């Protein structure tokens, strides 16, 4: 059975890690390189770095931040934010990223998913979806959660897979930063529409929330930020709880 992954997320603005609630009210959490290294040593399976204002500010990814962070890591490293072209993708890979997360650029040009997958492989392409409940469905948002697109999240995830995405990074905007639990209904809905791994994001607060999203949400991985940055949970302790609940995880020897 495939191991479930625990992923630490670094939301970066102006070269610093920040974290807020529902995508607003951001507060400083530290240096990306230092925090990434600490999370890796603490037992995180992967690190995701998201340059959360690159698209909104119309600029590229902070490559020097990516380079310094990659130098601290010995586990898979995903980078997102400001990646609009194959050249952007190549530059981020050259700085040490293992995978790319694309969101707004893929909505503007869905062929970008196919182009990056054809050049670098599907395993290197993560389709990031920021979703918010709108009535009986979930709507996809772009530009760091600032703009609704009208796209249905389930349909967009399925299209992303067809175009070559190797994973879905699914963030519940309703739950983001609240520490009240993942949106298991949303996660399960997306997981049922695709055959590629789904990473659940938004709402982690307790170990039980992780158990819930793996068991009820059928997530392949779960991502968190606040609870790791501010010392609420230790990754290895969390993994021991998951293992005791019958969820397969990679434990430190």
UniProtKB/Swiss-Prot annotation:
Can the keyword Glycosyltransferase be found in this entry's annotation? no
Would you tell me the Gene Ontology cellular component terms?
A: cytoplasm
Q: Which Pfam families match?
A: His_biosynth
Name the catalysed reactions: 5-[(5-phospho-1-deoxy-D-ribulos-1-ylimino)methylamino]-1-(5-phospho-beta-D-ribosyl)imidazole-4-carboxamide + L-glutamine = D-erythro-1-(imidazol-4-yl)glycerol 3-phosphate + 5-amino-1-(5-phospho-beta-D-ribosyl)imidazole-4-carboxamide + L-glutamate + H(+)
**Residues annotated as catalytic:** 11, 130
**Record GO biological process:** L-histidine biosynthetic process
Identify the SUPFAM superfamilies for this entry. Answer: Ribulose-phoshate binding barrel
Q: Which UniProt keywords apply?
A: Amino-acid biosynthesis, Cytoplasm, Histidine biosynthesis, Lyase
In which pathway is this protein known to take part?
A: Amino-acid biosynthesis; L-histidine biosynthesis; L-histidine from 5-phospho-alpha-D-ribose 1-diphosphate: step 5/9
Compartments it resides in: Cytoplasm
Q: What is its EC number?
A: 4.3.2.10
Q: Which GO terms describe its molecular function?
A: imidazoleglycerol-phosphate synthase activity; lyase activity
Signal peptide positions (record): none
Recorded hits in InterPro entries, A to Z, give: Aldolase_TIM (IPR013785), His_biosynth (IPR006062), HisF (IPR004651), IGPS_HisA/HisF (IPR050064), RibuloseP-bd_barrel (IPR011060)
Keyword Acyltransferase part of the UniProt annotation = no
Function per UniProt? IGPS catalyzes the conversion of PRFAR and glutamine to IGP, AICAR and glutamate. The HisF subunit catalyzes the cyclization activity that produces IGP and AICAR from PRFAR using the ammonia provided by the HisH subunit.
UniProt family annotation: Belongs to the HisA/HisF family.
Q: How does it assemble?
A: Heterodimer of HisH and HisF.
Task: Please identify the protein, giving its name as recorded.
Answer: Imidazole glycerol phosphate synthase subunit HisF
Q: Which source organism does the UniProt entry give?
A: Koribacter versatilis (strain Ellin345)
Taxonomic path: Bacteria, Pseudomonadati, Acidobacteriota, Terriglobia, Terriglobales
Identify the coding gene.
Answer: hisF
